[in-house]
Amino acid sequence: MTLHRFKKIALLSVLGIAAISMNVQAAERIAFIPKLVGVGFFTSGGNGAQQAGKELGVDVTYDGPTEPSVSGQVQLINNFVNQGYNAIIVSAVSPDGLCPALKRAMQRGVRVLTWDSDTKPECRSYYINQGTPAQLGGMLVDMAARQVNKDKAKVAFFYSSPTVTDQNQWVKEAKAKIAKEHPGWEIVTTQFGYNDATKSLQTAEGILKAYSDLDAIIAPDANALPAAAQAAENLKNDKVAIVGFSTPNVMRPYVERGTVKEFGLWDVVQQGKISVYVADALLKKGSMKTGDKLDIQGVGQVEVSPNSVQGYDYEADGNGIVLLPERVIFNKENIGKYDF
């Protein structure tokens, strides 16, 4: 082999390696952040997000704090921005606590979306939303009403925290619906488990002991609902109606034993998948406007809605809400069809 030919081959090899390196660097990277890791609900959402990444050929990283805190999420957001991620999708533990970090990310060209739990709308582009507050708050009350069946009743609300965006919006709507449609229902207490399984169980048992004549616990939280069911079993209380939101895999034994007659949710795997599809569309095509539609493999078509569907006054170009197609009521008859 001549020296000239050797140099030519070496040069081509270097160029080839450089091209491969550029392609790797150019690949889209999307971060999908839950409120915390180790909870089945968020793990299922992460599975959907990573499934979408494989379908679209983009790199999706699922990671979150071990405890639900603003500081933990901010640290992750900053790390992902510094690592050059193109998009961040976060389930926010606070409506405003993440805003400085998210606004800095947007200023650096990172696409910012929320899923499950929103920030203030000016702190993100799109919110992948499981349902409007009126839809989900109404769903909670209707599930309880199907079991309470009396004009005068005592009801407790039990969920994650007094600051989390989504659950407080649902509960506000649920309480308004109770006042309007069930004026004889007394809301005796509203308590919180702070996304901790042990504390949630202790709190649920405390509610049932303090209000022995309680008719219903409404628990729109993936930790609070199974904790309420377990507390009822521990205390041998089979008279209280327990409704709320959690995943079918977590709630299956309580439904099969009859402790919980029905509960609700949405397909959180789909929610994770839709989130990544929307982020990918933004990275490839730019912003979307109200009324724009997007086809999601295995899900169907979703549409961009204005922020007003969530009760917000804020509207801007490249900003809105993508609602999931449907919500689900789980019971003994259909829970076997679901695995997440």
Swiss-Prot record:
One of its GO terms (biological process) is transmembrane transport. It is found in: Periplasm. Its main location: periplasm. The keyword Signal applies. GO terms for molecular function: carbohydrate binding. Keywords: Periplasm, Signal. The keyword Signal applies. Residues 1-26 form the signal peptide. InterPro entries: Bact_Solute-Bind_Prot2 (IPR050555), LsrB (IPR030159), Peripla_BP_I (IPR028082), SBP_2_dom (IPR025997). GO terms for cellular component: ATP-binding cassette (ABC) transporter complex; outer membrane-bounded periplasmic space. Belongs to the bacterial solute-binding protein 2 family. Part of the ABC transporter complex LsrABCD involved in autoinducer 2 (AI-2) import. Binds AI-2 and delivers it to the LsrC and LsrD permeases. The complex is composed of two ATP-binding proteins (LsrA), two transmembrane proteins (LsrC and LsrD) and a solute-binding protein (LsrB). This is Autoinducer 2-binding protein LsrB.
